[in-house]
């Protein structure tokens, strides 16, 4: 993730990676009222990974790969000093055929497969995030076939949660919540009605509200401090240091909902601070630092 001003793309674009037969996505993120955006994110890499599967890390090599490809296609020069945040993940690709011409993961098929064991266990493997619904449909349909029922997966014709047409918003809070949650925003506004302090900022300088941390726990299965500040909101990606400063207060807010002891609160905070420190070590700047350096 980099400040939008470094790229200034008003639409998502696909750019080629020189000498690598791959492409990168360059996507504007978080629209502002003047028609511009706050951030642009760029990716992805496709490299073999041999580390812990439950904690994949974005390496300096990954960052340099993305930036080199970006700089080959834009007129500005984007450096590691401009990188605000990163995230990484793994995808389980189907094992290639023994006669496959290339051993590169980038050349492997992204199609998924549904397998059924002799004992009736249905497994879906391969695929990618953008085809998650189709993958689930195929797996559910296979399970229904094994059970001998005539029902089929219904998600093809169902709207996403919160999708109920355009909503007219009258306040900044309404605009923010309606934009992020759609019709589910009513639940967050109800939280604010019961406790007006939940309309306050979650992290200084970022758009998220305290009610969103509560909602993340009660409605979105957030189970850790990192879940709330990195995955349900994107606070850590947008301003790591401001988020780290807010982490103790956020921890106090969600701890009663999750039944945490003082020892668990301390462990949650320590883990989150360690994650931020790893990004500090990678040389990632915050948005505030980028703005200050640009003046």
Describe the role of every protein-language-model region.
Residues 1-10, 16-20, 29-40, 44-295:
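C-terminal accessory subdomains/tails of enzymes that are appended
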